[in-house]
C-alpha cells in the first residue's frame, strides 16, 4: 500500500527505509503521499513543493489537478509564484500574521502581489552586487564518497557567490556536508587559502573558518528549546567564557548586535526561534554563523520556504557578506535565484559535476540541459 501511494510521486524511494535515512525532498514526498492517502474532501498542503525538483513539482501538480477535478477543495500554502499560477483560482496574502487581501489569480499583477506580500514596492528581485572578487579561498579537488558523489571539483573565491545547483538528489547537500565535516570523503583533497586541510568534523571546519547553513533549519540549524540569543551564541560559546564562567550579559549583547546587523524582527531575543517567521528563523541561523570567525559560508537552500520580502533581505545579507570578503557557496534548486545571485554556477547530476558556467550569458535552459544530461554525455568535474 505504501509503495502504491508513493510511486506516483517518486519511483526512487524505498518504502522499507526509515524516514531518517531519506533526504529532505524524499521526506516531503512521503508526507504528501500520507496526506493524499486519507481521501479528504478538504486538503491543506503546506509548502509541498519546497524541496522538490521541477519534475517532481510537475508530478505533484498533476496529482493536485486530478484531486481538484474530483471535487476536493485544496488550500495550497506556498511562496512560489509558479505554484500559484499553475494551480490556484484565488490567492490570499498574509503578512506578519495579518490578512492582507484575496484576489482572483488572473486579475492581479506580479507587482501588486509582491507589494501586498512585502508591504512596499519591490522594484527588483535581486539586489545589486558590490563585492570585488579576489583570490581563490576554497578549492575542492576530485572528492568522492561512495554512494553519494564522485570526483567533484570546484573552487570559490573571496567575495564570490558560487551557485551549486542541479536536480534534487544530485549530491549537492552531501558535497557540502563533506566540506563541513559531517561526512568524510573517501578520496580527494580540500584546500583552504592554498593549503591542504583535513576536516574530520564540524568543529574542525569552524576552526578553519568554514560555516554551514543547513537545508533544514528546524532540525539542523536551530535549537527551539533555547532562546534566540543562545541559538546565536551556540556555535561559539567559548568566546563568552571568562574565568571559567559564562558571561551571559556579553552573550546577550553580542546577540543583540548581530540581530540588529541582519535586521531580525523579534520582540524578545529571550523567546524561542519557533516564535519567529520562517525568514526570521533563517536570519537567526545566519547570526549564529556570523558569531564565528569565518572565511567561507556554505548556504544550503538559504531561502527555502520564505516569502519574497524575506528572500530579498537574505540576498542583501549575502551581498553584504561578500562585500566584506566572505566566499559563499549557495546551494539552490531555484534557477532564477541561482542566475540572480551567483557569479559562477556549478551544475551537478547523480553525484557528478556536469557543467560549470559564468552567470553572465547563462540561461535557465542551459542549466536544465546540463542537469538532464544522459549518463554517457556526462563529463567528470
Predicted segments, located by residue:
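Glycine-rich phosphate-binding loops of nucleotide-dependent enzymes
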Residues: 1-381
Amino acid at each position: 500500500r505504501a509503495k502504491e501511494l508513493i510511486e506516483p510521486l517518486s519511483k526512487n524511494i524505498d518504502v522499507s527505509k526509515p524516514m531518517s535515512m531519506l533526504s529532505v525532498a524524499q521526506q516531503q514526498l512521503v508526507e504528501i503521499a500520507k496526506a493524499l492517502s486519507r481521501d479528504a474532501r478538504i486538503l491543506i498542503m503546506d509548502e509541498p513543493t519546497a524541496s522538490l525538483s521541477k519534475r517532481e513539482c510537475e508530478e505533484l501538480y498533476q496529482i493536485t489537478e486530478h484531486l481538484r477535478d474530483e471535487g476536493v477543495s485544496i488550500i495550497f500554502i506556498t511562496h512560489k509564484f509558479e505554484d500559484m499560477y499553475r494551480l490556484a483560482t484565488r490567492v490570499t496574502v498574509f503578512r506578519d500574521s495579518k490578512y492582507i487581501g484575496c484576489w482572483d489569480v488572473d486579475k492581479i499583477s506580479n507587482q501588486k502581489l509582491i507589494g501586498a506580500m512585502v508591504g512596499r514596492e519591490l522594484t527588483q528581485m535581486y539586489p545589486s552586487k558590490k563585492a570585488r572578487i579576489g583570490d581563490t579561498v576554497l578549492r575542492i579537488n576530485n572528492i568522492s564518497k561512495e554512494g553519494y558523489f564522485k570526483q567533484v571539483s570546484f573552487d570559490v573565491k573571496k567575495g564570490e557567490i558560487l551557485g551549486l545547483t542541479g536536480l534534487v538528489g544530485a549530491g549537492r547537500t552531501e558535497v557540502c556536508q563533506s566540506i563541513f565535516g559531517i561526512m568524510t570523503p573517501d578520496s580527494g583533497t580540500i584546500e583552504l587559502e592554498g593549503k591542504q586541510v583535513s576536516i574530520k568534523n564540524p568543529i574542525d571546519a569552524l576552526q578553519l573558518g568554514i560555516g554551514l547553513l543547513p537545508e533544514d533549519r528546524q532540525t539542523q540549524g536551530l535549537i527551539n528549546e533555547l532562546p534566540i540569543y543562545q541559538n546565536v551564541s551556540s556555535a561559539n560559546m567559548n568566546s563568552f567564557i571568562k574565568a571559567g564562567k559564562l558571561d551571559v550579559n556579553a552573550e546577550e549583547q553580542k546577540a543583540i548586535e548581530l540581530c540588529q546587523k541582519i535586521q531580525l524582527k523579534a520582540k524578545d531575543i529571550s523567546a524561542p526561534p519557533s516564535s519567529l517567521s520562517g525568514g526570521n528563523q533563517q536570519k537567526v541561523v545566519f547570526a549564529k554563523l556570523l558569531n564565528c570567525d569565518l572565511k567561507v559560508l556554505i548556504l544550503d537552500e538559504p531561502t527555502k520556504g520564505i516569502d519574497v520580502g524575506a528572500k530579498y533581505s537574505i540576498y542583501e545579507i549575502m551581498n553584504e557578506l561578500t562585500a566584506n570578503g566572505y566566499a559563499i557557496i549557495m546551494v539552490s534548486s531555484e534557477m532564477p535565484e541561482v542566475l540572480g545571485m551567483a557569479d559562477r554556477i556549478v551544475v551537478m547530476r547523480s553525484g557528478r559535476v556536469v557543467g560549470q558556467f559564468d552567470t553572465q550569458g547563462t540561461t535557465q535552459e542551459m542549466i536544465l540541459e546540463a542537469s538532464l544530461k544522459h549518463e554517457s554525455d556526462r563529463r567528470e568535474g
